[in-house]
């Protein structure tokens, strides 16, 4: 750590006039998460669920920060249709496309900070990053979710919009996740 609790490389994004971008991914299933709620005394609230469902969605979301600019949240859902042999998560090409879209939306260089997921270190993605002068990739230490602000977004979603909800269809799950992310995306101040 540098002076004042800031890492020595903490000025990399500022020196390049770049956006500081944290990225993470999460999966959400049709099975509702439990949260505390209230009800009249003697009446326990019950959320009814129609059987088990393997259908789920994965979401990759970069959060983008730059002094003097409004922070941004960009997200891409990926639906898992429940196929046993189909890909359930993002491929390196999906991440490449997400980074290209983020670069176009932000209109400037990116210093990307993400975890050590094996797909993040794939040869194709590494070659892509090396061939782009607008992209610098740094990795978080292993098992350090507290250093990634996107983890807080997943926590807000799970504790808020997705808690105690029985999703009737995968589309209902996707609509609810998007609604929660939009609310977080355009929230002017923390509550």
Where are these regions (language model features)?
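Short functional hotspots at interaction and active-site rims
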Residues: 1-191
